[in-house]
Amino acid sequence: MAYLKIVLVALMLVLAVSAMRRPDQQDQDISVAKRVACKCDDDGPDVRSATFTGTVDLGSCNSGWEKCASYYTVIADCCRKPRG
């Protein structure tokens, strides 16, 4: 019976600690930008040796960025900041 009490207390402590998150930690989790690299048309023909200079943006490119891939997808575009 003592073993069961120890296990229950330990589980309650784990639950309490995991439930106590500071509000600023929750905000940081949401605002983290997740970027994925993509290959622009002028990066080269071979995917293995090309440097990926583009960034995948969901929907369409952000303001001030240009679409750098000729292929079309409904969900995302391959974009980068204009050169020059």
Curated annotation (Swiss-Prot):
Domain of life: Eukaryota
InterPro entries: Myo_ane_neurotoxin_sf
Coiled-coil annotated spans: none
GO molecular function, one term: toxin activity
Positions annotated as propeptide: 20-33
Disulfide cross-links: C38-C78, C40-C68, C61-C79
One cellular-component annotation, GO: extracellular region
Keywords: Cleavage on pair of basic residues, Disulfide bond, Ion channel impairing toxin, Nematocyst, Neurotoxin, Secreted, Signal, Toxin, Voltage-gated sodium channel impairing toxin
Signal peptide boundaries: 1-19
Compartments (UniProt record): Secreted; Nematocyst
Protein family per UniProt: Belongs to the sea anemone sodium channel inhibitory toxin family. Type II subfamily.
Functional note: Binds specifically to the voltage-gated sodium channel (Nav) and delays its inactivation.
Protein name: Delta-thalatoxin-Cad1a
Organism: Cryptodendrum adhaesivum (Adhesive sea anemone)
